[in-house]
Amino acid sequence: MITRRFLCGCIPLVAASAITSRAFGANAECAVYTHDRQRALSSDKAIGLLKEGNERFASGRTVNCDLLAQAKETSTAQAPFAAIVGCMDSRVPPELVFDQKIGDVFSVRIAGNFAEKNIIGSLEFATKVTGVRAIVVLGHNSCGAIRGAIDDVQLGNLTATLANIRPAVASTLYEGDRSAGNSAFVQAVAEENVRRTVALLTQKSEINAALVEAGELRIVGAMHDLATGRVTFLL
């Protein structure tokens, strides 16, 4: 017969077991990346870690780590496993979207997540010097920079910035309303911009191209949904 006392005694044990299990998982997720740990990762595994992190973020199961402890551990060296080329939009912080911590990823952000020589040069440092295993070009829906490029906005230095996105506007295959007021067209251009950026990261970089050819680096594109938090990787 199961008594009230037995149940009351077991419940704390079950709860403690669950907490211990979560703590063990958190400890694994919170371990900082060393060069040995980074080099042991395949490029596919690096992408997989980002997918797993986004699943945690989108399902409300992010891992809580001691960030100050991580800052101290990484103060003398860094060995991130991936680099994210993202938009400067305040709603798309890559480290949070992929549930990564201090020292896990390089984050390169600019309005419209495009690639030009300074961004590509920064990524060559990440890939060749530091050894990241993957680059993700991360776009998002309802992007203001994409809308600005579609509308051919002229505004100070922003004009030159948006000029980097306009080729994606021109190359987007879309029949119908090609204005910034059409969210479907904006989404289509955003995805085309991501794909073009992915291509440019090897077309304009012999270093990245060689690493991809050697199987040491993967470069992929993805789109973030502002409402759900989910990231969809593009084929």
For each of these PLM feature ranges, what is it?
Residues 1-14:
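N-terminal secretory signal peptides and thylakoid transit peptides that target proteins
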